[in-house]
Amino acid sequence: MIQILSFLPLLAVTLGQAEPKAAANDAVREEQVRFLKEQAAELALHGAGDSKTTFTLGSPLLRYSNWAGLSSDGATFLWLSGARPVAVVSLSIRRPNNAVYRECSSLWPSGLDCRQGQASVWSPKRGGLLAQPLNDAPPAAEGDAQRLAQMRQIARRFQVTWHHSRTDEQTQLRMLSTPIYRFAAENEGIVDGGLFAFVITNDPEMLLLVEAVRKKPGEAGGWQYSLARMSSLKEVVRLDDREIWSVLNYHQDSTDDRKTGPYSEQKTGTYTPAAGGSGNKPQ
């Protein structure tokens, strides 16, 4: 008992030291997410050649850290047309020098124009792999919970590998079992939809959109899928162990236009923490 009691003051001191450290870490994370939100809010997405059509940017769908890669802090946002996903933007602060990177990926069948102020920073002509039918999937169920179970079963049929830029070593990405976004747009024939993320740690590297679609009222809904890359590395996607899509290393592919392709990665500056406030603008 004496030994236990003599340990208690040391434990109290240790816990007392841990609390300010945890509070400081929370404050840093709050500052960083505020900065990432500010950066996202500076972007406006329109239809190509149609500045009057502005898509809505939502709150962060996912907050992530990728200690297996470079990102120390990041957030993923989604542009919407009504409830439908249009495009994705991830903003991250990366080690070792707090470089700020912006990744954009289109899920839209036609052209887009992403602007920061008056400058066009990304103008994809098309999305990734879009609206591919899943003819062998069972008809969409009537209930929400049953359809969610179906979407998860469909998503588990996909495997995504990520290839190291120098060694080509493969890493299989992990699928988050809960969609990061779920929606319906029945006036556009989409009964239900879920956006699934394939991740390293919890950093999305590939997105899979699974949708239950119905062409006519009253008919049984079928299923379709779309894919959007969220990594500059080479990636290969398989469905039931059969390769269906691959993308080359973004920085080694001379055939892909950096500004008009469906995916873009850009360094936008450096994050500098401001004491007692939000991070500075990228320098």
Where are these regions (language model features)?
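Polybasic, proline/glycine-rich intrinsically disordered low-complexity segments
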Residues: 19-52, 65, 92-186, 206-283
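Bacterial Sec-dependent signal peptides at the C-terminal "C-region" and cleavage site
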Residues: 3-24
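Exposed beta-strand-loop-beta-strand "reactive/processing" segments of non-cytosolic proteins
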Residues: 56-92, 179-206, 210
